[in-house]
């Protein structure tokens, strides 16, 4: 979601969307888009760049306002909207406080985390206090990419969503896996946005890394493949015959979820994604039902009501 007050804070911080395009969002427009594409319910979230634009206090206030709005929308339109809480990272004290408020008081459905915060990827020891609390709560965590500081120095003219986003997610997933954080905090249900970035394509490469290099944990291939199957994956901007077969080879089939990236990706892309799932080779009716509905009901049992 991208309410007016968030977009204003975004602009005042001198930020721009990674596509360079203006974004319009209201709950009414969200419902119209959902209805037009046969979508019964959406889990809302604040995407990149999050809420921290350099001031800890302002970030706490903006996170609280976003989360309270998300809860309000869920109450106003029950059965149509859920939400992931946004946290004022990288400020850890504020993030832990907002996590408690959002999950205990507001009863939101989980948390969205950027793949990296202040240059530190998920799996970094500096972020472990947060992962420990998320693990204690068996929380659902959507991992969404951002623009790592290194991405901004490359000099490429192309919008960040085209390449840097999928690399950012992939770096976070690899760091979570090979740092051991994915196993240490095994109660967290991590969803990797955009089909896990390039992870499906390089999964075999990752599995043989211990054979090639002593710098990588010396794990057997199956342990690495099993780690990749622990993640959940959404289909935002990868719901095509090009990408889905690789994703289905990497992910557990019951851990693939429909994602749209709306409103940052226009409604036309939502329609293309729905058609892409229908037309992708190997996607049976049963698999498609899982991606479009059943797997989400497994992950979010409250949606059954």
PLM segments and residue spans:
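Histidine/acidic-residue-rich catalytic or RNA/ligand-binding cores of hydrolases
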Residues: 7, 52, 151-158, 196-211, ...
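Active-site gating loops and adjacent loop-to-helix segments of metal-dependent hydrolytic enzymes
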Residues: 1-25, 148-169, 206-230
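Conserved N-terminal glycine/acidic-rich loop preference
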Residues: 140-143, 147, 167-178, 182, ...
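Active-site gating/metal-coordination segments in enzymes
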Residues: 44-179
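Mid-to-C-terminal alpha-helical segments outside catalytic/metal-binding sites
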Residues: 1-41, 68-76, 97-101, 188, ...
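Acidic-and-aromatic substrate-binding clefts and catalytic sites of carbohydrate-active enzymes
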Residues: 21-25, 51-52, 89-95, 118-125, ...
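Active-site-adjacent C-terminal substructures of enzyme catalytic domains
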Residues: 166-170, 181, 187, 211-212, ...
């Amino acid at each position: 979601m991208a309410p007016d007050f968030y977009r204003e804070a975004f602009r005042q911080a001198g930020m721009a969307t990674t596509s360079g395009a203006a974004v319009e969002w209201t709950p009414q427009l969200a419902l119209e888009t959902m209805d037009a594409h046969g979508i019964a319910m959406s889990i809302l979230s604040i995407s990149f760049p999050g809420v921290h634009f350099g001031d800890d206090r302002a970030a706490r206030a903006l996170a609280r306002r976003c989360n309270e709005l998300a809860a309000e929308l869920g109450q106003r339109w029950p059965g149509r909207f859920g939400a992931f809480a946004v946290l004022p990272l990288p400020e850890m004290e504020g993030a832990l406080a907002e996590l408690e408020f959002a999950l205990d008081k507001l009863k939101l459905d989980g948390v969205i985390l950027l793949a990296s915060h202040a240059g530190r990827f998920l799996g970094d020891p500096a972020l472990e206090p947060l992962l420990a609390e998320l693990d204690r709560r068996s929380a659902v965590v959507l991992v969404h990419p951002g623009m790592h500081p290194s991405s901004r120095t490359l000099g490429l003219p192309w919008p960040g969503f085209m390449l840097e986003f999928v690399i950012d997610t992939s770096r976070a997933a690899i760091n979570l896996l090979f740092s051991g954080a994915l196993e240490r905090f095994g109660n967290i249900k991590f969803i990797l946005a955009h089909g896990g970035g390039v992870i499906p394509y390089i999964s075999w490469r990752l599995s043989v890394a211990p054979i090639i290099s002593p710098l990588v944990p010396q794990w057997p291939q199956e342990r690495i493949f099993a780690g990749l199957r622990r993640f959940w994956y959404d289909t935002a901007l990868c719901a095509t015959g090009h990408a889905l077969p690789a994703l289905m080879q990497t992910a557990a089939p019951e851990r693939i979820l429909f994602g749209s990236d709306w409103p940052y990706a226009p409604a036309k892309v939502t329609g293309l994604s729905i058609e892409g799932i229908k037309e992708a080779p190997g996607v049976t009716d049963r698999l498609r039902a899982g991606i479009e509905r059943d797997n989400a009901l497994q992950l979010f049992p409250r949606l059954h009501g």
